[in-house]
């Protein structure tokens, strides 16, 4: 039996992780949960999975959750805020922590889990993008296992099983191309929030769906792959694969290319991260390549996806530039989801913020947190300057 602390239980990764736990009750149990604001769903999850500790976003939400659980005989101990999330990550009786919190909010709980010696099933790419220089040395020092949950990084991890050290030559990260992959580039100026949220293949949360439309999700994954697999940025490439069947590929020293294929279903990488090094049998529909028929690949269009260039630029620059890229993107996407900026303005906000930043050379945690705060404030300042914003 593997015991799990689940950070972000009411989000997309969290609910699918609980689907796995429900499907394999003899293998997995949830001992800790965190959720920011969806107390109704969290209450349902607590009644079903009976965690011992939970954390929520505020004192008011703790009171609301307690009211929803009135009379429940398995009332968990409750904590509040970021400190509460860190408590669940570090003190819930668990062998593995699933980090399903979206954005840089997952950084501190992830560090708390690492410092407590917990293995990580990492679904939060922003943790390594923003905090790679801080997180990875701690992971190595503590000797914890870091198992990727992102479908692309899980695919790479699976492809590398049994590959001798030093044999990895190149990583090819596949991207669906997002909601606007078939739109004329000149029409992107008219793209709405509703348009951006219509992902052609995957069912995901709003933020990552917008990131898919801008290809920022892939840019962040390039930086994450750099930290996970130790390759220079020149050896990590992005390829558009509209069918989302090949989840990523690796090229080895002898030019062999190994790929991992499957239907676009996040439950598979979640299950692999939880069960590794085993592979558990599933009742899920197997991949039928004859039914799929055709798999296509093409280079990404830099004019359509300017965020891709910004991600490589920030990754190569290092320091706190990736932190600023990530934080500025989170704020820009939030502004877009609130319909305060247009689709094409997001990349302009990111570029302007990166240009204004002065990076710390070898950042510590204070540098990372400071750069994160500065970038968010700078994007808000740019948006508030004027309706024209001199970015258009």
Swiss-Prot record:
SUPFAM superfamilies xref list: 1-deoxy-D-xylulose-5-phosphate reductoisomerase, C-terminal domain (SSF69055), Glyceraldehyde-3-phosphate dehydrogenase-like, C-terminal domain (SSF55347), NAD(P)-binding Rossmann-fold domains (SSF51735)
Documented EC number(s): 1.1.1.267
Catalytic reactions on record: 2-C-methyl-D-erythritol 4-phosphate + NADP(+) = 1-deoxy-D-xylulose 5-phosphate + NADPH + H(+)
InterPro entries attached to this UniProt entry: DXP_reductoisomerase, DXP_reductoisomerase_C, DXP_reductoisomerase_N, DXPR_C, DXPR_C_sf, NAD(P)-bd_dom_sf
Metabolic or biological pathway, per its Swiss-Prot or TrEMBL entry: Isoprenoid biosynthesis; isopentenyl diphosphate biosynthesis via DXP pathway; isopentenyl diphosphate from 1-deoxy-D-xylulose 5-phosphate: step 1/6
GO MF, any single term: NADPH binding
GO biological process: isopentenyl diphosphate biosynthetic process, methylerythritol 4-phosphate pathway involved in terpenoid biosynthetic process
Enzyme class: oxidoreductase
Superkingdom, natural source: Bacteria
Cofactor requirement: Mg(2+); Mn(2+)
Record-listed Mn(2+) binding positions: 150, 152, 221
Keyword Oxidoreductase tagged: yes
Chain positions recorded as NADPH binding sites: 10-13, 38, 124, 126, 205
Positions bound to 1-deoxy-D-xylulose 5-phosphate: 125, 151-152, 176, 199, 212, 217-218, 221
Record keywords: Isoprene biosynthesis, Manganese, Metal-binding, NADP, Oxidoreductase
NCBIfam families for the chain: Dxr (TIGR00243), PRK12464.1 (NF009114)
General function of this protein: Catalyzes the NADPH-dependent rearrangement and reduction of 1-deoxy-D-xylulose-5-phosphate (DXP) to 2-C-methyl-D-erythritol 4-phosphate (MEP).
Family, as annotated: Belongs to the DXR family.
Protein's name in the database: 1-deoxy-D-xylulose 5-phosphate reductoisomerase
């Amino acid at each position: 039996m593997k015991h799990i602390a689940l950070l972000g239980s009411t989000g997309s990764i969290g609910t699918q992780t609980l689907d796995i736990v429900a499907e394999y009750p003899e293998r997995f149990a949830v001992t800790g949960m965190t959720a920011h604001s969806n107390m109704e769903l969290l209450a349902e999850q607590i009644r079903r999975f009976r965690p011992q500790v939970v954390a929520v976003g505020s004192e008011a939400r703790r009171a609301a959750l307690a009211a929803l659980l009135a009379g429940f005989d398995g009332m968990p101990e409750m904590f509040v805020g970021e400190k509460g999330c860190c408590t669940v990550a570090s003190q819930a009786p668990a062998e593995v922590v699933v980090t399903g919190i979206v954005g840089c909010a997952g950084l501190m709980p992830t560090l708390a889990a690492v410092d407590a010696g917990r293995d990580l099933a990492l679904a939060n790419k922003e943790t390594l993008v923003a905090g790679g220089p801080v997180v990875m040395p701690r992971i190595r020092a503590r000797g914890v296992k870091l198992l990727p949950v992102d479908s692309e990084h899980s695919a790479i991890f699976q492809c590398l099983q049994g590959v001798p050290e030093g044999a990895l030559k190149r990583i090819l990260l596949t991207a669906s191309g997002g909601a606007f992959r078939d739109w004329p580039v000149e029409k992107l100026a008219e793209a709405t929030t509703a348009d951006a949220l219509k992902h052609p293949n995957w069912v995901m949360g709003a933020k990552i769906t917008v990131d898919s439309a801008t290809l920022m999700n892939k840019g962040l994954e390039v930086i994450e792959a750099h930290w996970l697999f130790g390759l220079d940025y020149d050896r990590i490439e992005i390829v558009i694969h509209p069918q989302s069947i090949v989840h990523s590929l690796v090229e080895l020293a002898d030019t062999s290319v190994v790929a991992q294929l499957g239907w676009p279903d996040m439950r598979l990488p979640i299950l692999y991260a939880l069960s590794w090094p085993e592979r558990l049998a599933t009742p899920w529909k197997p991949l039928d390549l004859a039914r799929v028929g055709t798999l296509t690949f093409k280079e990404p269009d830099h004019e359509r996806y300017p965020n891709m260039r910004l991600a490589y630029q920030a990754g190569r620059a290092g320091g706190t530039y990736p932190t600023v890229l990530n934080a500025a993107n989170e704020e820009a996407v939030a502004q877009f989801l609130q319909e305060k900026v247009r689709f094409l303005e997001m990349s302009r906000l990111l570029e302007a913020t990166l240009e204004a930043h002065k990076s710390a050379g070898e950042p510590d945690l204070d540098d990372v947190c400071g750069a994160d705060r500065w970038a968010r404030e700078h994007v808000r300042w740019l948006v508030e300057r004027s309706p024209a914003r001199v970015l258009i």
